[in-house]
Amino acid sequence: VTGDSLETLADAQDFEYERRFLVTEFPAHLRDAPTLIVQSYYLADEGYALRVRVQASGLDAALDADSTPMSVLADHRGEISMATVTVKGPAVGGTRYEAERGLDPEVALELVHRGGRAMVKTRYSVWAGGDGWSVDVFGGANHPLIIAECERSGPVTDLQVPAFCVTELTDDRRFSNESLASTPYGGWVSAYLAELAATGPRLRADFGTNARLLPD
């Protein structure tokens, strides 16, 4: 494979395009297609990250502030069915370099147990406004954080934003998963909510036209 071919391959496959939003209340009737995720970060610096993730599809774990990543894995290790290793670059304008490949789940489980900074969350899939959304409900030190993401194969413009989204977090590095692994939301939630109350919610104006959906 030539250098030009590798560059073309990276351009086609190795980027993610997403917008992210804070959720404070996620309706129970929308909590469909759950996936338990535990992931550990072995490098996280200025937007660059190296991550190992293990997950169990169809598992709706009841996560709370006491749900540490290792205790959750101890309870559900036998249900882990998929694992990946991922390299990420800094996010700019809702676009981020991301290269990912599959791992043997048993090897990945041992890696998560043996090092890195781990976090746990349950991911739900929601269809809203013509887009598929992922809604992550965090446990452990990041409880009670909930983040909704809309990802497309190209820039996420002219978005219909669900009613459960409170304010946009796109490109706010504090809310990147690698930042949350090292500086969990539970330690600064009060300060952030005070900041949000002072500044008010926002939607980015540089991604085309935003529309608000009515509650489902």
Indicate where each model-derived feature is located:
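Phosphate-end processing signature that detects enzymes handling 5′-triphosphorylated RNA
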Residues: 2-216
